[in-house]
């Protein structure tokens, strides 16, 4: 399975509660962090939901 490197580039403050919860579910604890995940359909759906807050690189 492919890896995805996700960087949080914008704060979720001021966005819907569900979008903030998605940021936490992806593993971001503080702003401007980087996480690496497997590219599963569930992770891709979360990325699509908050794509305006993220920078995404596929490996």
Curated annotation (Swiss-Prot):
InterPro entries: Ribo_uL30_ferredoxin-like_sf (IPR036919), Ribosomal_uL30_bac-type (IPR005996), Ribosomal_uL30_ferredoxin-like (IPR016082). Disulfide bonds: none annotated. GO terms for biological process: translation. GO terms for cellular component: cytosolic large ribosomal subunit. One of its GO terms (molecular function) is structural constituent of ribosome. The keyword Transport does not apply. Pfam families: Ribosomal_L30. Keywords: Ribonucleoprotein, Ribosomal protein. NCBIfam families: rpmD_bact. Belongs to the universal ribosomal protein uL30 family. This is Large ribosomal subunit protein uL30. It comes from Brachyspira hyodysenteriae (strain ATCC 49526 / WA1).
């Amino acid at each position: 399975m492919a890896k995805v490197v996700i960087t949080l580039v914008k704060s979720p403050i001021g966005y819907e509660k569900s979008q903030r919860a998605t940021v936490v579910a992806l593993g971001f604890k503080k702003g401007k962090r980087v996480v690496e995940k497997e590219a599963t359909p569930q992770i891709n759906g979360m990325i699509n939901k908050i794509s305006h807050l993220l920078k995404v690189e596929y490996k």
